[in-house]
A protein has these predicted regions:
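Non-globular, low-confidence helical/coil segments that flank catalytic cores
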Residues: 1-160
Length: 160
């Protein structure tokens, strides 16, 4: 692995120093990103960092709501990765970005499709054709939430 991308919140972790030491040993570059960053990967591939705001972390449920949200773009295709953000972060993202900036072909649904994520307004802004939800079968949390699934289905979104 050549590079690892994290937000500044990673520095909060008690394991951060150990993490840094492993990266140095492996000669892996650590890239700390902030909202508004643009990473050119190849000619037609780039990543836009949508969130977090490293200068103003959300204090509520800090690890989830300050997850990296990034949009990976390749020519006319895009995918929005939302980490574990919840409604509070979604609302901040909606305030700061146009729907065009958030629109993506594929949405990696935030926080495993929990009831605390994927508001109607956020899903409508992203307007995905496909939604991917990372969950374990018969998990103890009841993810994904039925309301989240219904909101995605109303947009005729294929769910995986």
């Amino acid at each position: 692995m050549k590079n690892i991308i994290i937000s500044k919140q990673g520095e909060i972790s008690e394991n951060y120093k150990r993490f840094e030491d492993v990266l140095k040993k492996k000669k892996t570059k650590l890239i700390i990103v902030n909202k508004g960053d643009h990473l050119q990967i190849e000619k037609d591939v780039y990543i836009d960092i949508i969130w977090p705001d490293n200068s103003n972390f959300i204090k509520e449920n800090i690890l989830n709501n300050n997850s990296i949200v990034c949009k990976i773009n390749y020519k006319n295709f895009s995918m929005l990765f939302t980490g574990d953000i919840e409604e509070i972060a979604e609302n901040e993202i909606l305030k700061e970005n146009t729907p065009q900036k958030l629109k993506a072909d594929i949405l990696k649904v935030g926080h495993h499709g929990s009831k605390s994520s994927s508001t109607k307004e956020f899903i409508e802004a992203v307007s995905p054709k496909i939604a991917v939800i990372g969950v374990g079968l018969n998990n103890n949390f009841g993810h994904p939430n039925k309301g989240v699934l219904e909101r995605l289905k109303k947009l005729n979104c294929k769910i995986y």
